[in-house]
Amino acid sequence: IRLIKMLQKFKDPDITANGDKRASVPLIKAKTLWFNTGTLCNIECVNCYIESSPKNDNLVYISPDEVSDFLDQIVERKWATTEIAFTGGEPFLNPNMIEIARRCLEQNYKVLILTNAMLPMMRKSVQKGLLELLKQYNEKLTIRISLDHFKAIFHDTERGKGSYDITI
């Protein structure tokens, strides 16, 4: 009986295993579409919602073609999306992050990338790619750097010893 009840919860996506109507929110105005670029990260933050770390590769990197497919769907569905945002893990560990951002910018979306601004972002190929994108798309590209506190001791408590100095 327990197995049957468990399987029933997957029978109808709108009904819970107890027969109650499942809560839902209709997607009608997605102004910003968020992508998780993968679960790998160069640090381990205690507050990370997805438990990203240097070893957590549970979520594979999203590819440029997958993002392009979603961009096509935005157009097909006539959504009012104006911004594409990326989080992770650390987005700049995804080897395709610059190309992914370029595809979004080429289709006239604003792009927001959340980063810890540490070693992955300091790679020459990433810096070169970002400079090219900034030169061409300037104000359409926003890089938001995670800084948890203006004092190193509190930031480091969240993100690891020494992370404040590296970020700054």
Go through the PLM ranges and name each one:
Residues 3, 7-88, 92-110, 120-123:
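Conserved alpha-helical substructure of the radical SAM core
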Residues 94-168:
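Conserved AdoMet/S-adenosylmethionine-binding subsite of the radical SAM
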